[in-house]
């Protein structure tokens, strides 16, 4: 009788532990960024520190023998984007600094 009681409690404890682990793993992925420091984990799956947005890779099919363009060494989000005057009449353009 004592053995059945022990195994029953052990099975219940194991089920509760597995449910708790499942719950924590699902809610952890939905936490905001500042909670990552609290949990001690970094979720930087899609972060590429040395790549620019929207630029082709250094090797391309149309330029054999060349190493491609040299990318910016410092990332500047809108550093080289200059737009002309807007045709809609709502402004929207900025002129490049001399």
UniProtKB/Swiss-Prot annotation:
UniProt keyword Secreted, yes or no: yes
Signal peptide (residue range): 1-29
Compositional bias of kind Gly residues: 86-98
Positions of short motif SCOOP motif 1: 52-66
Biased segments, Polar residues type: 52-61
Expression tissues: Mostly expressed in leaves and seedlings shoots, to a lower extent, in roots, but barely in flowers.
UniProt subcellular location: Cell membrane; Secreted, Extracellular space, Apoplast
Highest taxon listed in the record's lineage: Eukaryota
UniProt short sequence motif SCOOP motif 2, positions renumbered to this chain: 80-94
GO MF: LRR domain binding; receptor serine/threonine kinase binding
Keyword Nucleotide-binding: no
Region annotation (Disordered) ranges: 50-98
Alphabetical keyword list: Apoplast, Cell membrane, Cleavage on pair of basic residues, Membrane, Repeat, Secreted, Signal
Residue ranges annotated as motif SxS motif essential for MIK2 binding: 58-60, 86-88
Cellular component GO terms, alphabetical: apoplast; plasma membrane
UniProt family annotation: Belongs to the serine rich endogenous peptide (SCOOP) phytocytokine family.
Function: Brassicaceae-specific phytocytokine (plant endogenous peptide released into the apoplast) perceived by MIK2 in a BAK1/SERK3 and SERK4 coreceptors-dependent manner, that modulates various physiological and antimicrobial processes including growth prevention and reactive oxygen species (ROS) response regulation. Inhibits root growth and regulates root meristems. Promotes ROS production and MAPK (e.g. MPK3, MPK4 and MPK6) activation in a MIK2-dependent manner, thus leading to the up-regulation of immune-related marker genes (e.g. WRKY30, WRKY33 and CYP81F2).
Quaternary state and interactors: Interacts with MIK2 (via extracellular leucine-rich repeat domain); this interaction triggers the formation of complex between MIK2 and the BAK1/SERK3 and SERK4 coreceptors, and subsequent BAK1 activation by phosphorylation.
Protein name per its UniProtKB record: Serine rich endogenous peptide 10
Naturally occurring in which organism (per UniProt): Arabidopsis thaliana
